[in-house]
């Protein structure tokens, strides 16, 4: 009966529009369950957008992992035309924004400012059932990673062998490297609702946190 009630609540919530179909929280450590729900129009449109630009991806089953953590309307990116390490399941909206950023911002900026082609993007992952890091003295809050709605990008590998990392190069002595990183952050801020960099706090000293929300927060 509990499972039926949970699925009914989710189905009713899905009727409200959008794709924020996170299940009611279950205790942390609960056994993951697969949710058999209709795919909303917004998610189907997102899948179509990825297919339209030639992205290979696999839709993932909606799953509730307990403790407020879930993957709803998510995909596994397989081939975006550029190798990306560390990518796991992520909500389709953040995947779509990530693809646009990689293709239309990172690639041309590297060519223009660094004189070389990006051959790999390194990330620190996407989905992770955890709280926001760096909230000392404030109540715990689930991270965007807990719903697969965020990605952490750490470095870019160039064809000429250079590795441009957020940790080492954010305040690089090389003005072109600094300009490249600042430029791609500005572009990310136009595509993602939240972008956090080493300028935000110590918890982001080694990556750019990219989240598909409506916060309009860029640091």
Segments predicted by a language model, with ranges:
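Sec-dependent signal peptide recognition
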Residues: 1-7
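C-terminal motif of bacterial Sec signal peptides marking the signal peptidase cleavage site
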Residues: 11-14
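Sequence contexts marking disulfide-bonded cysteines in secreted/extracellular proteins
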Residues: 16, 45-47, 68-70, 91-93, ...
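Proline-rich, low-complexity linker regions of envelope-associated factors in Gram-negative bacteria
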Residues: 17-43, 47
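Catalytic cores and adjacent binding grooves of peptidoglycan-active enzymes
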Residues: 20-23, 58, 96, 108-110, ...
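Active-site acidic/histidine clusters and adjacent loop/turn architecture
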Residues: 38-122
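Acidic helix-start/capping segments at beta-turn-to-alpha-helix junctions
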Residues: 60-74, 119-132, 201-214
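Active-site-adjacent substructure of cysteine-protease-like catalytic cores
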Residues: 112-148
């Amino acid at each position: 009966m509990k499972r039926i009630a949970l699925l009914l609540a989710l189905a009713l919530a899905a009727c409200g529009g959008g794709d924020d179909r996170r299940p009611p929280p279950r205790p942390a450590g609960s056994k993951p369950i697969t949710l058999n729900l209709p795919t909303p129009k917004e998610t189907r449109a997102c899948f179509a957008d990825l297919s339209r630009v030639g992205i290979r991806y696999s839709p993932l089953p909606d799953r509730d992992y307990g403790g407020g953590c879930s993957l709803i309307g998510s995909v596994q990116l397989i081939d975006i035309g550029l190798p990306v390490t560390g990518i796991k399941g992520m909500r389709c909206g953040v995947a779509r924004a990530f693809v646009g950023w990689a293709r239309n911002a990172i690639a041309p900026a590297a060519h223009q400012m660094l004189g070389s082609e990006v051959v790999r993007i390194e990330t620190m992952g996407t989905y992770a059932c955890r709280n926001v890091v760096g909230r000392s003295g404030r109540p715990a809050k689930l991270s965007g990673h807990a719903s697969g709605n965020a990605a952490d990008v750490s470095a870019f590998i160039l064809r000429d062998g250079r590795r441009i990392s957020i940790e080492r190069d954010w305040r690089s002595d090389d003005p072109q490297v600094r300009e490249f990183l600042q430029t791609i952050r500005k572009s990310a801020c136009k595509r993602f609702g939240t972008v956090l960099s080493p300028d935000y706090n110590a918890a982001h000293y080694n990556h750019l946190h990219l989240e598909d929300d409506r916060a309009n927060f860029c640091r």
